[in-house]
């Protein structure tokens, strides 16, 4: 909405300047896009009259004039404008005047004829008006008057970007109301007296779509002079609001729309057949619009018609066949209320966008129509003359908008604004906004506050938050003190020993893995291949038949993902996933035990393809090394061990190759161990059924078994030398080397700091069915240098324990 500040100040006079006014409007929620002067900077331009006008002796397109500016001497001025003529009242830039662009007027000679000034056009005064010649001022204007003062050009045009909810501000009336509220200033509306009818002519009005048009008013005005020129003050006000002057009738309806906020239309009465009918269009009905384009109407479009044809698209655009022309003498003025829901989107459907549709789409005050009709009639008679008939029309009171009654609680107001505004200020603000306010005094409950009945022009006040917004913006957001919210915060319980899952994810990504996320819903028959003998939870309403069971583990989803990637020529696959498995258990909550699991899978080549590196296929120990890296994050990796699957375990884990798989166990204390996961190569039979291409190794481990870590402790660094002793022991080939290393650590005593397996040998020199394990023993004291007796004692103790538990003997 673009408006003239001087026009606004005719209605309300805030004691602030233009810059402060623009800032105030913006802070109230009506964002100002631009504040621009309505004319350029100029001085020395006066009102003059052409008293002589003749042809230039040496130029066909120039005229020599004498101009009266109310002084003793007439001014000789040469002019080239086509509309320069005898008796014309003009804007004269006298010698010494300065026009926009610092253009100074001096005495000159044009083709030998002296010229003491210049007759100015709109553009030469920096006024944005399309015109072909010089500015024509109203006849009878006082000669010698400053043109800047005459046209009130010490003014600015303020362009406001209105949000969709503030349709009430699409008029000077609405903006004045808003500025008056913000400044506690009175609003002076123009006096609109009812125009007394002088004739009895009326046109019947029938509304067939009362829900779309609850009110329609019409008035006949006869014998008007449609060629009368709009007064300069009206043209200027329209121009400063961004509307071009067309003719007196159109200018008047546009003026009333800008002033009052009520779009209007004028029909040529002689082109109306019978009476006015407000109805929905017939599908395919055609109408030629004022711009000359013929459009085919949709059945959901509201039209104004007579008894034979459509005359206009209601609230959007008029029809050419019923429009006012230079031959028109009798008109029918229209002022109606159209429901926003029946106008919204219709203009866009026809590729139209008009000032009228913009206002009706967002909502027009349903009480304005009668006053707007009288205002338009008043102006039409003043400018064009004519004989006025009484206003007639039709309305459906039941379909007119009803005022909203909204409750505002004191507690809610304070809570949302974060500041307590005095109650008397709240009542004053709502009253100034046009609301009918009642106090609700209920101090014993949280309902104490007010009820407010919204005014007819505010469609957007419907709920409590709307009232709070109004109170806040009128009170002034700048007046609400900055106060940080106070919240009693309690830090989450955090144990430093907790192992974050993100740390494990990052480690696996750093080792070349990609994280996968598979569905928790799986194909039940396929799951039986991986976890036989356990009945999963079957979904009553699955997404599809192959996603009807809750998963019992993560391996099934990862294997399917490997197959998916291998089918897309991925020769190296490394994936991991963390997620829940769902184990039916009667004693658990809802009969279901949910456990967080971590699983991984590798397949294909060990490394990326490279000309200098052999592309070996992955094996069991590649994945075991990655899993050991995860266990090291706990800083307690010695508590974990890998044990070959027993025949019993093989039955429980048919997914794994019987000779290339192990269970993951953790020391549970009191010399007991707990199985927490599995690792191994996928069984060839299962590999075939899944469609895997080549060797695939998987692991799955309970997250609860690795989600804590041993916190580091400061220990003294020994300044005494460390000693290493290597022993080679012969044991049964079936003996687990991990168990033997753990036994060494347990039996080594206080001086043993580490024991590592560094060689395994089977062959010549070792009895069949036996193997030789070479173990490095590290010994050190923090108090003294160890003597041979100390070292020998520890080694002998270890050898004795190995002999007792595993039948081990030192290799010769």
Curated annotation (Swiss-Prot):
Residues 39-148 form the tRNA-binding domain. One of its GO terms (cellular component) is phenylalanine-tRNA ligase complex. Its EC number is 6.1.1.20. It catalyses: tRNA(Phe) + L-phenylalanine + ATP = L-phenylalanyl-tRNA(Phe) + AMP + diphosphate + H(+). Residues 718-811 form the FDX-ACB domain. GO terms for molecular function: ATP binding; magnesium ion binding; phenylalanine-tRNA ligase activity; tRNA binding. It is found in: Cytoplasm. Residues 401-482 form the B5 domain. SUPFAM superfamilies: Anticodon-binding domain of PheRS (SSF54991), Class II aaRS and biotin synthetases (SSF55681), Nucleic acid-binding proteins (SSF50249), PheT/TilS domain (SSF56037), Putative DNA-binding domain (SSF46955). PROSITE patterns: B5 (PS51483), FDX_ACB (PS51447), TRBD (PS50886). Its main location: cytoplasm. Belongs to the phenylalanyl-tRNA synthetase beta subunit family. Type 1 subfamily. This is Phenylalanine--tRNA ligase beta subunit. It comes from Photobacterium profundum (strain SS9).
